[in-house]
Regions:
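Active-site beta-loop-alpha junctions of metal-dependent nucleic acid enzymes
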Residues: 5, 9-12, 27-49
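Basic nucleic-acid-binding interfaces
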Residues: 29, 78-82, 122
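Short, acidic, Ser/Thr-enriched surface-loop or helix-capping motifs
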Residues: 18-19
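Hydrophobic "anchor" residues
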Residues: 23-24
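C-terminal domain-tail junction helix/linker
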Residues: 73-77, 99-175
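Two-metal-ion RNase H-like nuclease active-site motif
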Residues: 1-4, 15
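RNase H-like polynucleotidyl transferase catalytic core
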Residues: 55-59, 73-92, 108-113
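Acidic/histidine-rich, metal-coordinating catalytic segments
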Residues: 42, 48-65, 138-141
Length: 175
C-alpha cells in the first residue's frame, strides 16, 4: 500500500500477516519496496518465526519479480499470487489494510519515514494485543495464539499420559 509524507514524497508500506491467527508480523514503511526489501523482511521473519509454508501476495512488481520467486523456490516456500483484480482472494489482508489506512495513514500527517515507522510499530503492537477478530472467536491475535498454545500443550500432556498408561504393565489380580 502507498501514501505520501507531508512534503509529497511517496512511501510504500509492506504488511505481512499470519493467515492462522491474523497476527501482524511485519508493518514497515519505506520510500520504495523493491523485491530485495521484501526478501529482507522474509529473512528477518525467518529468524524470528521460521519459514512459512506459503505466502499469498497480490501482483505488485515487488511480488512478481524473479528474485522473490527464486528466493521462495530456494527456501521451499509456495508463492501464491491472487488473480489480478480479485482482492477478495486476499480479503483478510484487504480488511487489515483498511484498518491500517484508517488508523494510521489517514489519521496522521507524517513528516518523515521514521515517524511513520514509530507509529507503525505502536499500531502493530496494539492491533496484535487488542484487536478482536470474529474469525478468532472475537479474540485478538495474541489471545488466540495463547489459547491455541495452551490447547496444544494440554493435548500433548493428555497424549503423554495416555501413552504412559498404555505402556505400564497391566495389573492382574491373583486368587
Amino acid at each position: 500500500m502507498s501514501d505520501a509524507l507531508d512534503n509529497g514524497r511517496r512511501i510504500r508500506v509492506l504488511n505481512v500477516i499470519d493467515d492462522f491467527n491474523r497476527e501482524a508480523l511485519w508493518v514497515d514503511a519505506q520510500y520504495s519496496y523493491p523485491s530485495e526489501f521484501v526478501i529482507r523482511a522474509l529473512q528477518n521473519l525467518e529468524v524470528e518465526r521460521g519459514l512459512p509454508v506459503k505466502i499469498r501476495v497480490d501482483n505488485g512488481p515487488e511480488f512478481i519479480s524473479h528474485k522473490l520467486r527464486n528466493y521462495c523456490e530456494e527456501k521451499g516456500i509456495n508463492l501464491e499470487h491472487i488473480k489480478p483484480g480479485t482482492p477478495t482472494q486476499n480479503a483478510y489482508v484487504e480488511r487489515f489494510n483498511r484498518h491500517f489506512r484508517e488508523d494510521v495513514l489517514d489519521a496522521y500527517l507524517f513528516g518523515s519515514l521514521q515517524q511513520v515507522n514509530i507509529i507503525c510499530d505502536k499500531w502493530k503492537q496494539d492491533y496484535n494485543d487488542n484487536h478482536p477478530h470474529r474469525s478468532l472467536g472475537y479474540r485478538s491475535p495474541k489471545a488466540f495464539k495463547e489459547l491455541y498454545r495452551k490447547e496444544i500443550i494440554y493435548s500433548e500432556s493428555v497424549k503423554a499420559k495416555m501413552n504412559d498408561s498404555l505402556q505400564s504393565p497391566a495389573l492382574t489380580e491373583s486368587t
